[in-house]
Amino acid sequence: MSKFNRIHLVVLDSVGIGAAPDANNFVNAGVPDGASDTLGHISKTVGLNVPNMAKIGLGNIPRETPLKTVAAEINPTGYATKLEEVSLGKDTMTGHWEIMGLNITEPFDTFWNGFPEEILTKIEEFSGRKVIREANKPYSGTAVIDDFGPRQMETGELIIYTSADPVLQIAAHEDIIPLDELYRICEYARSITLERPALLGRIIARPYVGEPGNFTRTANRRDLAVSPFSPTVLDKLNEADIDTYAVGKINDIFNGAGINHDMGHNKSNSHGIDTLLKTMGLAEFEKGFSFTNLVDFDALYGHRRNAHGYRDCLHEFDERLPEIIAAMRENDLLLITADHGNDPTYAGTDHTREYIPLLAYSPAFKGNGLIPVGHFADISATVADNFGVETAMIGESFLDKLV
């Protein structure tokens, strides 16, 4: 019999809690990540007021320097620790795949200076359309269509851009480049980015409509991902007929592998929380695992190095945390964590190599305290242990620490 009937894992995308031991092996604009500290620097520079996460034990997580504005609780309501990444990457897919039990020894490729000419030329030759070279760099998805949408409407050229993650995105106005053509081009791009020097996690079709100054991305987005190279704990759960629910971009990250209920993309963190609450309230969800990603911290504020916005986003999540707790059933377990760092006060615009926090709460808890510092995959090992399935490649369960 499972200790917890349901486990809800919520990933606060990029909410790191201090430089990892190997952080100096990773760089941002030429600066090693060794001094990065997403939560620490936000707390220090703009203040951080997250009483509900603090109540569970956020301020109790061991650090060289305590979080300046998040005090340790004498009697927290849950358990807390920080976890280290072992995989050779600091991107979204690597972080999530490791959380689910994989060790990624060959990281995906990211393109901070845009894609090589060879890739763009192949896409041009296949599609018969030119590529707007000025867009070929990490770009905000809304900004890139504002900047180059008018030109695309005039010329029919392709808008190809990337981000901090190993993705190639193609934006196309639906009245200029029909959806079936866009999807066909994306499928070709997928076929040429499956190995080095361009091993990409996802190709994303980004259709939009509207007029210059008033463009809107549509729901016709399509993701062409790669599946994890080895079974994850999601697959193990699925094989055991244990329900798995994905909220936000989780289904895309795993290419649907091991997920039997995709609850859809999030329009915002708030919308994602609404979807999680709806999922938790499903009468048929009596036993199983929900996996939620809230990406606004990373996409809207981390990469844009906006510490005030990042702080406010954390406040907004913390204000809604009581709703999540109220939706829990007696034998539910809530795990709150991250997938990498993205220090909004740091050099560059890339993710930062950091520990991730882990907060654990259940109405059934009799105890509280610290869990020993571990690794990302310990989360999936704990989920597997709870439901009586095999672990994946790596991870040590801390289930017996939760009492």
Curated annotation (Swiss-Prot):
<dbReference type="InterPro" id="IPR006124">
    <property type="entry name" value="Metalloenzyme"/>
</dbReference>
<feature type="binding site">
    <location>
        <position position="303"/>
    </location>
    <ligand>
        <name>Mn(2+) 2</name>
    </ligand>
</feature>
<dbReference type="GO" id="GO:0000287">
    <property type="term" value="F:magnesium ion binding"/>
</dbReference>
<dbReference type="InterPro" id="IPR017850">
    <property type="entry name" value="Alkaline_phosphatase_core_sf"/>
</dbReference>
<dbReference type="GO" id="GO:0006015">
    <property type="term" value="P:5-phosphoribose 1-diphosphate biosynthetic process"/>
</dbReference>
<feature type="binding site">
    <location>
        <position position="339"/>
    </location>
    <ligand>
        <name>Mn(2+) 1</name>
    </ligand>
</feature>
<feature type="binding site">
    <location>
        <position position="298"/>
    </location>
    <ligand>
        <name>Mn(2+) 2</name>
    </ligand>
</feature>
<feature type="binding site">
    <location>
        <position position="340"/>
    </location>
    <ligand>
        <name>Mn(2+) 1</name>
    </ligand>
</feature>
<protein>
    <recommendedName>
        <fullName>Phosphopentomutase</fullName>
        <ecNumber>5.4.2.7</ecNumber>
    </recommendedName>
</protein>
<dbReference type="GO" id="GO:0030145">
    <property type="term" value="F:manganese ion binding"/>
</dbReference>
<feature type="binding site">
    <location>
        <position position="351"/>
    </location>
    <ligand>
        <name>Mn(2+) 2</name>
    </ligand>
</feature>
<keyword id="KW-0963">Cytoplasm</keyword>
<comment type="function">
    <text>Isomerase that catalyzes the conversion of deoxy-ribose 1-phosphate (dRib-1-P) and ribose 1-phosphate (Rib-1-P) to deoxy-ribose 5-phosphate (dRib-5-P) and ribose 5-phosphate (Rib-5-P), respectively.</text>
</comment>
<keyword id="KW-0413">Isomerase</keyword>
<comment type="similarity">
    <text>Belongs to the phosphopentomutase family.</text>
</comment>
<keyword id="KW-0464">Manganese</keyword>
<dbReference type="InterPro" id="IPR010045">
    <property type="entry name" value="DeoB"/>
</dbReference>
<dbReference type="GO" id="GO:0008973">
    <property type="term" value="F:phosphopentomutase activity"/>
</dbReference>
<dbReference type="GO" id="GO:0043094">
    <property type="term" value="P:metabolic compound salvage"/>
</dbReference>
<dbReference type="InterPro" id="IPR024052">
    <property type="entry name" value="Phosphopentomutase_DeoB_cap_sf"/>
</dbReference>
<comment type="pathway">
    <text>Carbohydrate degradation; 2-deoxy-D-ribose 1-phosphate degradation; D-glyceraldehyde 3-phosphate and acetaldehyde from 2-deoxy-alpha-D-ribose 1-phosphate: step 1/2.</text>
</comment>
<dbReference type="GO" id="GO:0005829">
    <property type="term" value="C:cytosol"/>
</dbReference>
<feature type="binding site">
    <location>
        <position position="13"/>
    </location>
    <ligand>
        <name>Mn(2+) 1</name>
    </ligand>
</feature>
<dbReference type="Pfam" id="PF01676">
    <property type="entry name" value="Metalloenzyme"/>
</dbReference>
<dbReference type="GO" id="GO:0006018">
    <property type="term" value="P:2-deoxyribose 1-phosphate catabolic process"/>
</dbReference>
<keyword id="KW-0479">Metal-binding</keyword>
<dbReference type="GO" id="GO:0009117">
    <property type="term" value="P:nucleotide metabolic process"/>
</dbReference>
